[in-house]
Amino acid sequence: MRDRLLAAEKVKAIDWRDDALYLLDQRVLPFEEVWHRYTTAEGVAEAIRTMVVRGAPAIGISAAYGAVLAARARIAQGADWYPALEEDMQLLADSRPTAVNLFWALNRMRDRLMRVKDGDDPLAALEAEAVAIHLSDREANLTMAQLGADLIRKHQGNLQTVLTHCNTGALATGGFGTALGVIRAAHLEGMIERVYADETRPWLQGSRLTAWELANEGIPVTLNADSAAAHLMRTKGITWVIVGADRITANGDVANKIGTYQLAVAAMHHGVRFMVVAPSSTIDMEMASGDDIVIEERDGRELLEVGGQRVGAEVEAFNPVFDVTPADLIDAIVTEKGIVERPDTARMAQLMSRKHLH
């Protein structure tokens, strides 16, 4: 399966070369493919904040490279560079508050810096660490893809009709995707009849990104309005809902793109299995439950403007980016460490105590 996934790879969103970070601008896909070059932490933070790059794993990887760019600039300034570097790290951390991969990656960069020995090059150490974060996410994607496909076969070996939400493919990660990685692997093994992709308002990641990725690989995909999801489950034989995650808490609650919670409720009602696919870096064992998650809200103009015109001067907007799906609505969480079925606090702790990949 690994070789087949590698052979099918067509899309990437992050490239590190010539001492600069290149990001594919996901705001203009699929109509344009525009790459931006970044040489400062400030630029990377702005790219994360404005969603040039999005998807929890991709945000974490980009932040790690942003830390390298910050270190290069600060070290060049001479003595006492570390406090200034920490300010840059905080700037990166503040760019998106919900995706735990962002903080995980920056903490890993801090830890690596603390382990640099006297006489060693801190910049080289940080660059190597950022590259390692990038490559490890790619490897995690491959492992999760196989584990998720195996889980589908375990429960239902026949052709599957899958519903997915937002974008969880190569554009959102350092490799092949989380939820879309599982769908890719299942398709290569002949188990996918059709994928239904929620359009995912208001940024339309499903229609602009997911449908584009799947169509490019010849995977049968149908785009649907978010509000059609429950009707699809009732009438179109949906067998799995497969989504990603931006943060998973110690009890198995999942923060993901707004609309995920209502999918889980509808899936439970219709007897449709619900799978979450995310690397272990998305799991925050310091956060007890989803009640503790800070939910990012974006500018109301994303909802209030249609065709550049405001819909009503007195109308207010509620525009949360994420919601929290309780663990008791989730059939399985798939990570590179293994699978947790019917997640709870004890099962999540057991998963995270594993020292080796599944």
Swiss-Prot record:
Family of this protein: Belongs to the eIF-2B alpha/beta/delta subunits family. MtnA subfamily.
EC class: isomerase
Keywords of this entry: Amino-acid biosynthesis, Isomerase, Methionine biosynthesis
Described function: Catalyzes the interconversion of methylthioribose-1-phosphate (MTR-1-P) into methylthioribulose-1-phosphate (MTRu-1-P).
Protein name: Methylthioribose-1-phosphate isomerase
Catalytic activity: 5-(methylsulfanyl)-alpha-D-ribose 1-phosphate = 5-(methylsulfanyl)-D-ribulose 1-phosphate
Enzyme Commission designation: 5.3.1.23
Stored HAMAP family: Salvage_MtnA
One annotated GO biological process: L-methionine salvage from methylthioadenosine
Pathway this chain belongs to: Amino-acid biosynthesis; L-methionine biosynthesis via salvage pathway; L-methionine from S-methyl-5-thio-alpha-D-ribose 1-phosphate: step 1/6
Site (Transition state stabilizer): C166
InterPro entries, per the entry: IF-2B-related, IF-M1Pi, IF_2B-like_C, Initiation_fac_2B_a/b/d, M1Pi_N, NagB/RpiA_transferase-like
Active site: D246 (proton donor)
Example of a GO MF term: S-methyl-5-thioribose-1-phosphate isomerase activity
Taxonomic superkingdom: Bacteria
Residues that coordinate or bind substrate: R54, G55, A56, R96, Q205, N256, K257
